[in-house]
């Protein structure tokens, strides 16, 4: 079970089930700004003060390495991708369905759901056009009828979209998510290992990191892995297992910051603890296996994460 945290205090109210509690947020009640997590086989208990571990408890974990995902964690990238797609549709006057009076424009509400339904840029467009009709455009005056022409349409749109996305990232208008830079600097100052592990292509991640966290911080990472560096992508745990090996740190002493259930699954399968900073497109996902859930990292300090990791107690 995960603790869901927002900018207001963490509050506790009795639930209808004996021996359990529910978490509530309200400025009108007494808040608990710090908590520890005891994880048992049957249930989880949250407490403000330290609670003695069961005799059978395994050794406490120690935060030795902090690992960040990139898209969704360091930057909220999905809306930027949506903007780049819509700019491509406008540039090539993509009409879908062909009878439409205006170029295609994916709304924020639609894209939040769509990007969790179909992964990858080209598969997204292919799926959408198959469902809604292959479009007219300045690339093809009439809807493409054969596989080669359809592939050319999608390739052209994707290539233009990719370059547009790079322009947006380089524009200086994109900011990292709240608290990310401060938390990275805290970890480095405390002598913790720092890594970024992303399922995206290496060139895309490098572009984002150099422009958002700056080149000096990027070069100061103890480990950087992208989707190109492992055979299987998340939710396969390979990228996190490889990171632990390169960092020289036990998986149990690593803490991962993710934004989606796919990333959470990759971290937990690797044997690592994970906290979630959700986005608008992932907020409804099931994060029960995370040790904490936040809307962002603005109020999260390194000592908070150390306390979380140190007080995870698993019944033997």
Curated annotation (Swiss-Prot):
Stored Pfam families: Hydrolase
TM helices/strands, residue ranges: none
Binding site for Mg(2+): 69, 71, 259
EC number: 3.1.3.-
Keywords linked to the UniProt accession: Chloroplast, Hydrolase, Magnesium, Metal-binding, Plastid, Transit peptide
GO cellular component: chloroplast; chloroplast envelope; chloroplast stroma; plasma membrane
CDD domains from the UniProt entry: HAD_CbbY-like
One GO MF term: hydrolase activity
Compartment list: Plastid, Chloroplast
Active site, renumbered: 69, 71
Annotated transit peptide: 1-46
Highest taxon of source: Eukaryota
Enzyme class label: hydrolase
Cofactor: Mg(2+)
SUPFAM superfamilies listed in its UniProt record: HAD-like
NCBIfam families, alphabetized: HAD-SF-IA-v3
Recorded family membership: Belongs to the HAD-like hydrolase superfamily. DOG/GPP family.
PANTHER family per the UniProt record, alphabetical: OS08G0485900 PROTEIN (PTHR42896:SF4), XYLULOSE-1,5-BISPHOSPHATE (XUBP) PHOSPHATASE (PTHR42896)
Name this protein carries in UniProt: Haloacid dehalogenase-like hydrolase domain-containing protein At4g39970
């Amino acid at each position: 079970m995960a603790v869901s945290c927002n900018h207001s205090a963490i509050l506790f109210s009795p639930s209808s089930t004996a021996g359990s509690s529910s978490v509530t947020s309200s400025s009108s009640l007494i808040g608990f700004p710090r908590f520890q997590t005891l994880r048992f086989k049957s249930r989880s208990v949250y407490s403000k003060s330290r609670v003695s571990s069961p005799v059978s408890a395994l050794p406490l974990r120690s935060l030795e390495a902090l690992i960040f995902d990139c898209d969704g964690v360091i930057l909220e990238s999905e809306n930027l991708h949506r903007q780049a797609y819509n700019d491509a549709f406008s540039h090539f006057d993509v009409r879908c369905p062909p009878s439409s009076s205006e170029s295609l424009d994916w709304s924020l509400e639609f894209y939040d759901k769509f990007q969790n339904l179909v992964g990858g840029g080209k598969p997204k467009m292919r799926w959408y056009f198959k469902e809604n009709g292959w479009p007219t455009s300045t690339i093809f005056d009439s809807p493409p009828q054969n596989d080669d022409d359809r592939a050319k349409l999608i390739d052209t749109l994707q290539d233009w979209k990719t370059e547009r996305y790079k322009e947006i990232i380089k524009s200086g208008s994109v900011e990292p998510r709240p608290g990310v830079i401060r938390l990275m600097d805290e970890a480095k100052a405390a002598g913790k290992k720092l890594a970024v592990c992303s399922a995206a292509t290496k060139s895309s991640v490098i572009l984002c990191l150099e422009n958002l966290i700056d080149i000096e911080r990027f070069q100061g990472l103890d480990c950087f892995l992208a989707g190109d560096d492992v055979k299987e992508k998340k939710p396969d745990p390979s990228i996190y297992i490889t990171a632990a090996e390169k960092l020289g740190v036990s998986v149990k002493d690593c803490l991962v910051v993710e934004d989606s259930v796919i990333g959470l699954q990759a971290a937990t399968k690797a044997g690592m603890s994970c906290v979630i900073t959700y986005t608008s497109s992932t907020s409804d996902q099931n994060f029960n296996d995370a040790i904490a859930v936040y809307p962002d990292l603005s109020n999260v300090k390194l000592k908070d994460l150390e306390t979380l990791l140190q007080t995870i107690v698993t019944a033997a």
